[in-house]
Swiss-Prot record:
One of the GO biological process terms: carbohydrate derivative metabolic process
DNA-binding region of this protein: 40-59
The protein, known as: Uncharacterized HTH-type transcriptional regulator in aarA 3'region
PROSITE patterns: HTH_RPIR, SIS
Domain called SIS: residue spans: 125-265
Annotated source species: Providencia stuartii
Keywords: DNA-binding, Transcription, Transcription regulation
All residue ranges annotated as the HTH rpiR-type domain in the record: 4-80
Coiled coil: none
Transmembrane segments: none
One Gene Ontology term of the molecular function aspect: DNA-binding transcription factor activity
Length: 282
């Protein structure tokens, strides 16, 4: 019996059922959490019917007995909760609902972002990071947070990287890159004028360019050699529920894992040296 069939039948009994059927259906729909640990006698008492009525009810619903009914009910309950989380947050949600809905929204946004990643492109970008003399990072406003996170990850594994939150310093970088460098630009929507200007400067220098931005055909995407896309939902970002920076970090971390597989021995040595330096601080 399908999961949605059971709930549909219970809801139908509220309208056309009689006496015992209605009482059991109402309890099962309104008291989902309470039912989980109940045996036949406990359900009968809670719903105000006899134990025999419960057994008869389950058989009328198409089950061999109470145990089979309960297994299907709990499966149906799992789907019900998942569907109830699909809606957006609203001012009337209690704390438990806020936690659950937020978690579901983060999971969905992350999964959708990872689905946008092309393995061949990831391989190519990871190899470019390995081969680059320097990694030059561009990011302004809140995108600078992501750029700094990337910068810190790279220098920890002894990869030469440049970043400054100062726009004028970034402009200086973009004017002085060469063909041996690799630019990684971070922009939420791909239409930040300063970022696009610096990408144009880097392109004129013959420097390879990567852009980490929302999926689509914005100007930054057209200017870059390769793109790391992430899932962008205007409604979620405008309300501040999920920020682009979270998803951008997840996408880069995924790329970074690939990079680490290409430089494993060097990474281990670099991290060991870092730990030793920290220990020496006492």
């Amino acid at each position: 019996m399908g999961m949605s069939t059971l709930t549909s039948k219970l809801e139908s009994l509220l309208n056309r059922g009689k006496g015992t059927e209605q009482r059991l259906a109402r309890f099962l729909l309104d008291s989902r959490d309470n039912f989980v640990a109940m045996n036949v006698a406990e359900l009968a008492q809670a719903a105000g019917v006899s134990s025999a009525s419960v057994i008869r009810f389950t058989r009328q619903m198409g089950y061999r007995g109470y145990s089979d009914f309960k297994v299907d009910y709990l499966s149906d309950e799992k789907q019900y909760k998942a569907e109830s989380l699909s809606g957006s947050l609203n001012p009337y949600d209690d704390t438990e609902q806020i936690i659950a809905k937020s978690g579901q929204m983060f999971i969905t946004a992350i999964e959708k972002s990872l689905e946008l990643l092309d393995p061949n492109t990831m391989d190519e970008i990871a190899q470019k990071i390995v081969e680059a003399k320097r990694i030059v990072l561009f990011g302004v406003g809140t995108s600078a947070i992501v750029a700094y996170d990337i910068f810190y990850k790279l220098i920890r594994v002894n990869k030469y990287a440049l970043f400054s939150p100062d726009l004028h310093v970034q402009l200086s970088y973009s004017s002085n890159v060469d063909a041996d460098d690799l630019v990684i630009a971070i922009t939420a929507k791909g239409n930040t004028p300063d970022i696009n200007h610096m990408l144009k400067l880097a392109n004129k220098k013959g420097c390879s360019t990567i852009v980490l931005t929302r999926f689509g055909q914005d100007e930054a995407v057209r200017l870059a050699d390769l793109v790391l896309p992430y899932f962008y939902d205007e409604q979620l970002f405008q309300t501040g529920v999920i920020t682009p920076q979270v998803l951008q970090m997840v996408v880069f971390d995924t790329l970074f894992f690939k990079y680490l597989t290409l430089t494993n021995e060097d990474v281990v040595l670099a991290l060991q040296k870092e730990r030793e330096a920290i220990i020496q601080l006492g």
